[in-house]
């Protein structure tokens, strides 16, 4: 990249290295300027420095900077983390659960109305709140969901194997029979 940049007159290796060094020094005052920061101060300072570097004038611009290509759970976690850095966060886990309950009730209400646009919106709000709970508990929501996905597959495999022992295919069982196998798998 540096060679192409040099050939096209944009930059050379020296400019790239100087830029990287400047960025490292600016973003790490606790290392290069003997500034004592705890982790929350470091993260807050880091975000402020990144905003300054990019000429951003608002916190929202930092939220918009989170890449759209990220999985939605990861993006939601990053959005909530940045909001929490400036103090927009729940004080207590009880508040998080109350928010989840509120969003759940709103989803139920919209399901009764049957408008898919609002159902989708409320489902998104509920998922966002659950990701916030995971963040609040210091649990990676992607990892937690992947564990549950694998648990479901393992239980489903158990059901299928046990149906086979009865000389039946899983899809030939009634829902009650499948539920019985599901409970056995747990």
Each predicted region: which residue ranges?
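Flexible "arm" and connector segments at domain edges
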Residues: 1-123, 128-186
């Amino acid at each position: 990249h540096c060679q192409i940049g040099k050939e096209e007159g944009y930059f050379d290796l020296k400019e790239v290295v100087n830029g990287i060094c400047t960025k490292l020094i600016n973003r790490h005052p606790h290392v290069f300027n003997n500034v004592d920061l705890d982790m929350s101060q470091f993260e807050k300072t880091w975000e402020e420095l990144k905003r300054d570097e990019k000429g951003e004038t608002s916190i929202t611009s930092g939220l918009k900077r989170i890449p759209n290509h990220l999985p939605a759970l990861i993006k939601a976690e990053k959005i909530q983390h940045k909001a929490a850095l400036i103090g927009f966060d729940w004080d207590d886990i009880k508040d998080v659960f109350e928010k989840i309950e509120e969003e759940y009730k709103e989803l139920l209400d919209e399901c009764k109305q049957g408008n898919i646009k609002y159902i989708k919106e409320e489902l998104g709000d509920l998922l966002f709140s659950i990701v916030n709970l995971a963040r609040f508990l210091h649990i990676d929501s992607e990892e937690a969901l992947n564990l549950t996905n694998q648990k479901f597959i393992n239980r489903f495999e158990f059901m299928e194997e046990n149906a086979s022992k009865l000389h039946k295919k899983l899809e030939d069982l009634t829902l009650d029979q499948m539920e019985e196998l599901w409970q056995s798998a747990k």
